[in-house]
Amino acid sequence: FSLLFLLPASTSFANHIKGGFFTYKYLGTTGNKLRYNVKLTVYMGCNPNPGQLNPTINFSVYDAGTRQHIRDITVDMSRQADLVKKADEQCITGDQSGCYYTIVEYDLAELELDANSAGYYIAYQRCCRIANVDNLIASSTIGNTYMIQIPGSNVSVEAPRNSSATFLVNDTAVVCSNSFFTFNFSASDPDGDQLSYEFCDAWVGGSQLEPIPSRATAPPYDVVNYSFGFSGGQPMGTNVKIDPTTGVISGVAPNITQTGEYVITVCVTESRNGKVIASTRKELHIRVAPCVPIQATLDPVYPTCDGFTRTFSNNTPSVEIKTHYWDFGDGNFSTEAQPTHTYADTGVYKIKLIVNRGDACSDETEADVKVFP
């Protein structure tokens, strides 16, 4: 009997957390009371065991000015679903279909709060993350903190009537190691506020000794220990950036050193009439796979200072690339994979490469060739 009793506790903190985010929706005001719908979306590994699926959790509420604990609210699980990619990408090698995440939502239909000047923090903490995350040290021992701030009247009179930005839940983009990729991390705002995006730190929360704290602590929170070469601002290294206006992450994906999982946290700031109203954050493990996309990739510029002849090749070769078409920008062309071309005169030429020309998996790119012998 005692062994059966202990099993759920031991499995409850097994590695499974893969990110998540809070959102809230303003419902109205009655007297001095503000009402909100608050929802937490949690990403976890597929096929979680029963100890990892908590039927109820606690949202902890704090005064944002004093950090005083206001109350804990028990919230029921409202939805569970798998985020599945049903088919492989036609123009990428390898298998990409299958389950990427199990999504669990906790929806608090109505939270009533006293109007105040500083606003409120709402937090939840849970341990632990999956093992062997490439950009974290000892990831399986690290928990997670999810938090969002509801603004108070000290931001503006209208700020407490704000509804947060909300992120899309469509995170099955295929990212291939050492290849260029884009990943849409954009959000939408029901109030029409202007949104800006930046990478930010992932937070620690919970522990192996206390995997499910009954009360989340108040901020500030400890930052996770990133592996060498990575940080909250550079979660996938120096070659990956986020567009501050669109929220699209792009760049050349790093190598796979362990599982290929990289923790990414994006903070979104809402501005109204030029003034910051609120912010929210989403954390997610992006999976980097050992696949090869069909891409035409060249260096931005090819300088030649020792003659008129240059050899070219695609920077992202693949067995799935069947044909090459080169336009050297001077009226000459080639269909070789690695052509050598001699220019007749000095100048700057626009070279174009098309791979699998006329095929469903065609791609093209351009670069400048500067001939100054």
State each model region's role.
Residues 15-373:
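Extracellular/lumenal mature domains of secreted and surface-exposed proteins
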Residues 1-8:
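Bacterial N-terminal signal peptides
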Residues 10-14:
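Sec/Tat signal peptide C-region and signal peptidase I cleavage site
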